[in-house]
């Protein structure tokens, strides 16, 4: 049994990584409990197959020490701080604890991967995803590789007519960042230089809030806003399968 604890503090990023990891472990026939403290966020990116997966269970964090038995392995994603009753449960079951860290290409990942750590009376081990054979590597799903291989077909994919555009589309994903004005200005100049028009897909949540704030707009899901040669299209968040297709088929992300 592998138990993954996710604390959603970073839009869809934390939940997305944990979901991909859980799904990949299930593909290896591991039984996975994915505990998330924000089910509304994770529900927006799960695939239909996830809800039917007999190896994957997605639920809220347990509220009592004895409400779940954390056997075998516990993965703490991105320095998540767990309640004391969960640590007591871990100690009781003598589970292996892994601290999943953020993906980085920095050299320190080679040295820190698999290092032990001691906290709350529990020994845990750091797991650093990365790009060398001294790190934990990357989670790359088979379906993603197939889509990458068939990229030319994806370029023609219109996502059920959601994002029709005669030229090219760009996906814009951001957090609170005032540089969005600078990015749009440069994209406008680029579009004019190439004599092209671009559709920019902006997803609901923090990316849309950031855009509205810095452009003094009030866009919502389904709206389209014209900015010179750019057409800003607001989309609901899509599941990871469709998001992968969007990324692969887009002009730039």
Task: Describe the predicted segments one by one.
Residues 39-46, 106-109, 178-181, 207-215:
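Short, charged/polar "capping" segments at the starts of alpha-helices
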Residues 61-63, 201, 208-253:
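Donor nucleotide-activated moiety binding/catalytic core segment of transferases
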Residues 1, 72-73, 96, 169, ...:
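Structural motif
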Residues 182-194:
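Short hydrophobic signal-anchor/transmembrane segments that target glycosyltransferases
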Residues 1, 165-170, 197-199:
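Charged active-site motifs of nucleotide-sugar-dependent glycosyltransferases
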Residues 102-181:
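A nucleotide-sugar donor-handling region in carbohydrate enzymes
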Residues 5-30, 34-122:
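Active-site and donor-binding regions of nucleotide-sugar-utilizing enzymes
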Residues 191-204:
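A conserved nucleotide-sugar
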């Amino acid at each position: 049994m592998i138990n993954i604890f996710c604390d959603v503090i970073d839009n869809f990023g934390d939940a997305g990584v944990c979901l991909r990891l859980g799904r990949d472990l299930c593909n290896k026939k591991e039984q996975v409990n994915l505990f998330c403290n924000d089910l509304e966020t994770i529900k927006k990116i799960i695939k239909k197959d996830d809800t039917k997966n007999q190896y994957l269970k997605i639920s809220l964090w347990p509220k009592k020490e004895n409400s779940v038995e954390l056997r075998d392995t516990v993965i703490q994603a991105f320095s998540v701080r767990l309640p004391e009753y969960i640590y007591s449960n871990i100690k009781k079951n003598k589970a292996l604890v892994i601290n999943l860290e953020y993906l980085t290409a920095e050299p320190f990942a080679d040295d820190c991967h698999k290092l032990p750590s001691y906290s709350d009376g529990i020994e845990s081990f750091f797991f650093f995803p990365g790009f060398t054979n001294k790190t934990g590597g990357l989670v790359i799903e088979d379906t993603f590789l197939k889509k990458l291989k068939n990229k030319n077909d994806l370029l023609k994919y219109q996502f059920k007519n959601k994002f029709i555009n005669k030229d090219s589309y760009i996906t814009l994903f951001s957090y609170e960042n005032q540089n969005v004005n600078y990015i749009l200005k440069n994209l406008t100049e680029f579009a004019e230089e190439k004599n092209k028009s671009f559709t920019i897909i902006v997803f609901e949540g923090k990316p849309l809030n950031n855009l509205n704030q810095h452009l003094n707009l009030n866009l919502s899901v389904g709206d389209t806003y014209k900015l010179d040669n750019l057409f800003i299209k607001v989309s609901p968040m899509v599941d990871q399968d469709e998001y992968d297709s969007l990324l692969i088929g887009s002009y730039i992300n």
